[in-house]
Swiss-Prot record:
<keyword id="KW-0064">Aspartyl protease</keyword>
<dbReference type="InterPro" id="IPR000250">
    <property type="entry name" value="Peptidase_G1"/>
</dbReference>
<dbReference type="InterPro" id="IPR038656">
    <property type="entry name" value="Peptidase_G1_sf"/>
</dbReference>
<keyword id="KW-0732">Signal</keyword>
<feature type="disulfide bond">
    <location>
        <begin position="248"/>
        <end position="257"/>
    </location>
</feature>
<keyword id="KW-1015">Disulfide bond</keyword>
<keyword id="KW-0378">Hydrolase</keyword>
<feature type="propeptide">
    <location>
        <begin position="21"/>
        <end position="54"/>
    </location>
</feature>
<feature type="disulfide bond">
    <location>
        <begin position="101"/>
        <end position="181"/>
    </location>
</feature>
<dbReference type="GO" id="GO:0004190">
    <property type="term" value="F:aspartic-type endopeptidase activity"/>
</dbReference>
<dbReference type="Pfam" id="PF01828">
    <property type="entry name" value="Peptidase_A4"/>
</dbReference>
<dbReference type="InterPro" id="IPR033863">
    <property type="entry name" value="Scytalidoglutamic_peptidase"/>
</dbReference>
<feature type="site" description="Transition state stabilizer">
    <location>
        <position position="107"/>
    </location>
</feature>
<dbReference type="InterPro" id="IPR013320">
    <property type="entry name" value="ConA-like_dom_sf"/>
</dbReference>
<dbReference type="GO" id="GO:0006508">
    <property type="term" value="P:proteolysis"/>
</dbReference>
<keyword id="KW-0865">Zymogen</keyword>
<comment type="subunit">
    <text>Monomer.</text>
</comment>
Length: 260
């Protein structure tokens, strides 16, 4: 499991801002989440702490590669069912940076909520995340996620529902909010945070139990155009109240995370 340094952790704790948690039900709640994101809610970089007072000691579960010049990260993941009530949530995504480098994250993925609703989203952290339009996600769907960094400040995020055939993409160009280091590549299950509009008050959402296990299959990473093996990936778990709530592992080109 990867541990952040004290300096990185200090910077992270002061900047813990994430995309919105659920509000009401159905369309109105999804609209509220979109409005909340527009108000300034963001995804969180990797957080790992040992403080006794911390409720969520690790907010990422999955696989992290540390290297250089990462260009692309892609995988296909199944959409699980979730429980835990309308306020409970979780997310699955692929991305570049956010662990040892936290100046920016290029990422895309999908959220699940305890009432059976789902979102598809993209983000260039520290800018706000946003929902994709033109794509729907349902339990059991197969979602292909990919991000491409063409430079430290430009790239793209693409999401395709292989079950329905819907495909959406977002391009980023000359992003001034933060530059990628391109030193991390990730396949992640996350317990994300809900913050107010200016990011001054953040809380982790209740982490929704999910089943079956989320499997990132056909995981692919390239560095300067060359394929990178997952053999050296570091495994992390979501840890809440000193308990692992995910069981993540890597086998070949598959990253599997189950709820425990």
């Amino acid at each position: 499991m990867k541990f952040t340094t004290a300096a990185v952790l200090s910077a992270l704790v002061s900047a813990e801002i994430a995309f919105a948690a659920p509000g009401g039900n159905g369309f109105a709640r999804r609209q509220a989440r979109r409005q909340a994101r527009a108000a300034g809610l963001k995804a969180s970089p990797f957080r790992q702490v040992n403080a006794k007072e911390a409720t969520v000691e690790s907010n990422w579960g999955g696989a992290i590669l540390i290297g250089s010049d990462f260009d692309t990260v892609s995988a296909t993941a199944n959409v699980p069912s979730a429980s835990g009530g309308s306020s409970a949530a979780g997310t699955a995504w692929v991305g570049i940076d956010g662990d040892t480098c936290q100046t920016a994250i290029l990422q895309t993925g999908f959220d699940w909520y305890g009432d059976g609703t789902y979102d598809a989203w993209y983000e260039w952290y520290p800018e706000v995340s946003d929902d994709f339009s033109g794509i729907t996600i349902s339990e059991g769907d197969s979602i292909q996620m990919s991000v491409t960094a063409t430079s430290d400040t430009s790239g793209s995020a693409t999401l395709e529902n292989l079950t329905t055939g819907q495909k959406v993409s977002k391009s980023f160009s000359n992003e001034s909010s933060g530059s990628l280091c391109r030193t991390n590549a990730e396949f992640i299950i996350e317990d994300f945070e809900e913050c107010n509009s200016n990011g001054s008050d953040c809380e982790f959402v209740p982490f929704a139990s999910f089943s079956p296990a989320v499997e990132f299959t056909d995981c692919s990473v390239t560095s300067d155009g060359e394929s990178v093996s997952l053999d050296d990936a570091q495994i992390t778990q979501v840890i809440i109240n000193n308990q692992d709530v995910t069981d993540c592992s890597v086998s070949g080109t598959t990253v599997s995370c189950s709820y425990v």
